[in-house]
Amino acid sequence: AHILNYFMVAVTLIVVSVPEGLPMSVTLSLALSMNRMLKTNNLVRKMHACETMGATTVICTDKTGTLTQNQMQVYQTNFYNLKEQKLGEDELSNLIKEGISTNSTAFLDFSEEKVKTLGNPTEAALLLWLNGQHQNYLELRENATILDQLTFSTERKYMATIVQSPLLGKKVLYVKGAPEIVLAKSNRVAINGTCKPVAECKAGIEKQLLDYQNQAMRTLGFAYQIIEDGKDETFFVEGRLHDTDLTYLGIV
Protein backbone atom coordinates (compact mmCIF):
# COMPACT_ATOMS: atom_id res chain seq x y z
CA ALA A 1 0.00 0.00 0.00
CA HIS A 2 2.86 2.37 0.82
CA ILE A 3 4.55 1.60 -2.53
CA LEU A 4 1.33 2.36 -4.42
CA ASN A 5 0.94 5.59 -2.49
CA TYR A 6 4.50 6.66 -3.27
CA PHE A 7 3.97 5.85 -6.97
CA MET A 8 0.77 7.92 -7.13
CA VAL A 9 2.51 10.88 -5.46
CA ALA A 10 5.41 10.67 -7.94
CA VAL A 11 3.07 10.58 -10.95
CA THR A 12 1.07 13.49 -9.50
CA LEU A 13 4.23 15.59 -9.07
CA ILE A 14 5.29 14.90 -12.66
CA VAL A 15 1.89 15.86 -14.04
CA VAL A 16 1.59 18.98 -11.90
CA SER A 17 5.13 20.21 -12.69
CA VAL A 18 4.31 20.54 -16.42
CA PRO A 19 1.76 23.34 -16.99
CA GLU A 20 -1.24 22.25 -19.02
CA GLY A 21 -0.78 24.94 -21.65
CA LEU A 22 3.02 24.60 -22.04
CA PRO A 23 3.07 22.14 -24.99
CA MET A 24 0.58 24.27 -26.90
CA SER A 25 2.54 27.45 -26.11
CA VAL A 26 5.79 25.91 -27.35
CA THR A 27 4.10 24.65 -30.53
CA LEU A 28 2.55 28.04 -31.25
CA SER A 29 5.85 29.81 -30.62
CA LEU A 30 7.71 27.53 -33.04
CA ALA A 31 4.93 27.89 -35.63
CA LEU A 32 5.14 31.69 -35.44
CA SER A 33 8.92 31.46 -35.78
CA MET A 34 8.51 29.32 -38.92
CA ASN A 35 6.15 31.92 -40.36
CA ARG A 36 8.57 34.79 -39.67
CA MET A 37 11.46 32.87 -41.23
CA LEU A 38 9.35 32.07 -44.30
CA LYS A 39 8.79 35.79 -44.87
CA THR A 40 12.60 36.17 -45.18
CA ASN A 41 12.78 33.30 -47.73
CA ASN A 42 13.88 30.68 -45.17
CA LEU A 43 11.71 27.56 -45.48
CA VAL A 44 11.82 25.40 -42.32
CA ARG A 45 10.68 21.82 -42.94
CA LYS A 46 10.78 20.59 -39.34
CA MET A 47 9.34 22.73 -36.58
CA HIS A 48 12.05 22.04 -34.00
CA ALA A 49 14.69 23.32 -36.45
CA CYS A 50 13.54 26.83 -35.45
CA GLU A 51 14.92 26.23 -31.97
CA THR A 52 18.23 25.12 -33.47
CA MET A 53 18.42 28.22 -35.66
CA GLY A 54 17.66 30.41 -32.65
CA ALA A 55 20.69 29.02 -30.84
CA THR A 56 23.00 29.33 -33.87
CA THR A 57 25.70 32.03 -33.77
CA VAL A 58 27.73 31.22 -36.91
CA ILE A 59 26.54 29.93 -40.29
CA CYS A 60 29.07 28.73 -42.88
CA THR A 61 27.62 28.92 -46.39
CA ASP A 62 28.51 29.43 -50.02
CA LYS A 63 27.98 33.03 -51.20
CA THR A 64 27.50 33.07 -54.98
CA GLY A 65 24.10 31.76 -55.96
CA THR A 66 23.09 31.19 -52.32
CA LEU A 67 23.29 34.54 -50.60
CA THR A 68 23.66 36.46 -53.86
CA GLN A 69 22.37 35.99 -57.42
CA ASN A 70 25.76 36.32 -59.19
CA GLN A 71 24.49 39.52 -60.81
CA MET A 72 26.36 42.80 -60.56
CA GLN A 73 25.61 46.40 -61.42
CA VAL A 74 27.61 49.62 -61.51
CA TYR A 75 26.98 51.54 -58.29
CA GLN A 76 29.20 54.55 -58.99
CA THR A 77 31.56 55.82 -61.69
CA ASN A 78 34.38 58.28 -61.24
CA PHE A 79 35.90 59.20 -64.59
CA TYR A 80 37.75 62.31 -63.47
CA ASN A 81 37.15 64.50 -66.54
CA LEU A 82 33.60 63.30 -67.31
CA LYS A 83 31.07 65.99 -66.37
CA GLU A 84 28.24 64.66 -64.18
CA GLN A 85 29.39 61.15 -65.18
CA LYS A 86 27.18 61.27 -68.28
CA LEU A 87 28.42 60.15 -71.69
CA GLY A 88 28.19 62.48 -74.66
CA GLU A 89 29.86 62.73 -78.06
CA ASP A 90 33.16 64.30 -76.95
CA GLU A 91 36.51 62.52 -77.19
CA LEU A 92 36.57 61.40 -73.55
CA SER A 93 33.08 59.90 -73.82
CA ASN A 94 34.11 58.11 -77.01
CA LEU A 95 37.15 56.66 -75.25
CA ILE A 96 35.07 55.43 -72.32
CA LYS A 97 32.20 53.88 -74.27
CA GLU A 98 34.41 52.33 -76.94
CA GLY A 99 36.83 51.04 -74.30
CA ILE A 100 34.07 49.36 -72.31
CA SER A 101 32.44 47.92 -75.44
CA THR A 102 35.51 46.51 -77.17
CA ASN A 103 37.68 45.60 -74.17
CA SER A 104 35.15 42.99 -73.04
CA THR A 105 34.00 39.45 -73.78
CA ALA A 106 30.50 39.75 -72.24
CA PHE A 107 27.18 40.12 -74.08
CA LEU A 108 23.66 41.32 -73.31
CA ASP A 109 20.59 39.38 -74.45
CA PHE A 110 17.62 41.63 -75.29
CA SER A 111 15.39 38.82 -76.60
CA GLU A 112 13.18 38.90 -73.49
CA GLU A 113 11.57 41.71 -71.53
CA LYS A 114 14.26 41.51 -68.86
CA VAL A 115 17.80 41.92 -70.18
CA LYS A 116 19.95 38.84 -69.62
CA THR A 117 23.71 38.98 -69.20
CA LEU A 118 26.10 36.48 -70.76
CA GLY A 119 29.71 36.10 -69.71
CA ASN A 120 31.70 37.69 -66.91
CA PRO A 121 29.30 39.37 -64.42
CA THR A 122 31.63 42.34 -63.91
CA GLU A 123 31.96 43.04 -67.63
CA ALA A 124 28.22 42.51 -68.09
CA ALA A 125 27.56 45.13 -65.39
CA LEU A 126 29.64 47.63 -67.38
CA LEU A 127 27.62 46.89 -70.52
CA LEU A 128 24.40 47.40 -68.55
CA TRP A 129 25.72 50.77 -67.40
CA LEU A 130 26.42 51.70 -71.03
CA ASN A 131 22.92 50.60 -71.97
CA GLY A 132 21.57 52.81 -69.20
CA GLN A 133 23.48 55.70 -70.78
CA HIS A 134 21.62 54.97 -74.07
CA GLN A 135 24.73 53.60 -75.77
CA ASN A 136 24.62 50.59 -78.11
CA TYR A 137 27.62 48.54 -77.01
CA LEU A 138 27.20 45.97 -79.80
CA GLU A 139 27.24 48.61 -82.52
CA LEU A 140 30.36 50.18 -80.99
CA ARG A 141 32.03 46.77 -80.78
CA GLU A 142 31.16 45.75 -84.33
CA ASN A 143 32.22 49.07 -85.86
CA ALA A 144 35.66 48.92 -84.25
CA THR A 145 38.29 46.51 -85.56
CA ILE A 146 39.98 44.51 -82.80
CA LEU A 147 43.64 44.10 -83.75
CA ASP A 148 44.95 42.27 -80.67
CA GLN A 149 43.69 41.35 -77.23
CA LEU A 150 44.85 40.11 -73.83
CA THR A 151 41.90 38.49 -72.08
CA PHE A 152 41.53 38.97 -68.34
CA SER A 153 43.37 36.60 -66.02
CA THR A 154 43.47 36.44 -62.23
CA GLU A 155 47.26 36.31 -62.40
CA ARG A 156 47.89 39.64 -64.14
CA LYS A 157 44.56 41.20 -63.01
CA TYR A 158 43.88 43.25 -66.15
CA MET A 159 42.59 43.00 -69.71
CA ALA A 160 43.89 44.92 -72.71
CA THR A 161 42.65 45.36 -76.28
CA ILE A 162 44.10 47.20 -79.27
CA VAL A 163 41.44 48.48 -81.69
CA GLN A 164 41.27 50.51 -84.86
CA SER A 165 38.85 53.16 -83.63
CA PRO A 166 36.33 54.63 -86.10
CA LEU A 167 35.38 57.25 -83.47
CA LEU A 168 38.92 58.58 -83.10
CA GLY A 169 40.31 57.56 -86.48
CA LYS A 170 43.38 56.01 -84.81
CA LYS A 171 44.59 52.86 -83.14
CA VAL A 172 43.84 52.84 -79.42
CA LEU A 173 45.02 50.58 -76.61
CA TYR A 174 42.35 50.11 -73.94
CA VAL A 175 43.19 48.65 -70.52
CA LYS A 176 40.96 47.80 -67.57
CA GLY A 177 41.64 45.85 -64.39
CA ALA A 178 42.55 46.15 -60.74
CA PRO A 179 42.92 49.92 -60.16
CA GLU A 180 46.28 49.68 -58.39
CA ILE A 181 47.70 47.53 -61.21
CA VAL A 182 46.42 49.77 -64.00
CA LEU A 183 47.56 52.90 -62.14
CA ALA A 184 51.05 51.44 -61.72
CA LYS A 185 51.26 50.95 -65.50
CA SER A 186 50.05 54.50 -66.26
CA ASN A 187 52.26 57.57 -66.71
CA ARG A 188 49.60 60.25 -66.25
CA VAL A 189 46.06 60.81 -64.98
CA ALA A 190 43.34 62.65 -66.93
CA ILE A 191 41.92 64.88 -64.18
CA ASN A 192 40.55 68.40 -63.72
CA GLY A 193 40.42 69.04 -67.46
CA THR A 194 44.08 68.22 -68.00
CA CYS A 195 46.65 65.45 -67.56
CA LYS A 196 48.85 65.25 -64.47
CA PRO A 197 51.72 62.90 -63.56
CA VAL A 198 50.62 59.84 -61.61
CA ALA A 199 52.84 60.85 -58.67
CA GLU A 200 50.73 63.98 -58.08
CA CYS A 201 47.44 62.08 -57.98
CA LYS A 202 48.43 58.71 -56.52
CA ALA A 203 47.69 59.51 -52.86
CA GLY A 204 44.20 60.83 -53.64
CA ILE A 205 43.36 57.85 -55.84
CA GLU A 206 44.57 55.37 -53.22
CA LYS A 207 42.44 57.09 -50.56
CA GLN A 208 39.43 56.87 -52.84
CA LEU A 209 40.06 53.17 -53.44
CA LEU A 210 40.30 52.57 -49.69
CA ASP A 211 36.92 54.26 -49.20
CA TYR A 212 35.38 51.96 -51.82
CA GLN A 213 36.99 48.88 -50.25
CA ASN A 214 35.61 49.83 -46.83
CA GLN A 215 32.15 49.73 -48.44
CA ALA A 216 32.88 46.21 -49.79
CA MET A 217 32.76 47.43 -53.40
CA ARG A 218 34.58 45.79 -56.28
CA THR A 219 36.51 48.41 -58.27
CA LEU A 220 38.00 48.61 -61.76
CA GLY A 221 40.52 51.07 -63.15
CA PHE A 222 40.48 52.26 -66.78
CA ALA A 223 43.30 53.58 -68.95
CA TYR A 224 44.07 54.13 -72.63
CA GLN A 225 46.84 54.99 -75.05
CA ILE A 226 46.43 56.45 -78.52
CA ILE A 227 48.89 54.73 -80.85
CA GLU A 228 50.31 57.22 -83.32
CA ASP A 229 50.37 56.40 -87.03
CA GLY A 230 53.48 54.53 -88.10
CA LYS A 231 54.20 53.28 -84.60
CA ASP A 232 54.21 49.50 -84.83
CA GLU A 233 55.61 48.56 -81.46
CA THR A 234 54.61 45.30 -79.80
CA PHE A 235 52.60 46.10 -76.68
CA PHE A 236 51.89 42.49 -75.71
CA VAL A 237 54.94 40.41 -74.82
CA GLU A 238 54.56 36.94 -73.31
CA GLY A 239 51.00 37.66 -72.26
CA ARG A 240 51.71 40.99 -70.55
CA LEU A 241 51.72 44.70 -71.38
CA HIS A 242 55.07 46.01 -72.51
CA ASP A 243 56.46 49.52 -73.10
CA THR A 244 53.16 51.39 -72.76
CA ASP A 245 52.38 55.08 -72.22
CA LEU A 246 48.96 54.88 -70.59
CA THR A 247 46.66 57.66 -69.41
CA TYR A 248 44.51 56.76 -66.40
CA LEU A 249 40.85 57.69 -66.88
CA GLY A 250 39.18 56.78 -63.61
CA ILE A 251 37.47 54.17 -61.46
CA VAL A 252 34.19 52.28 -61.66
Residue positions per predicted region:
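Conserved cytosolic headpiece of P-type ATPases
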Residues: A1-V252
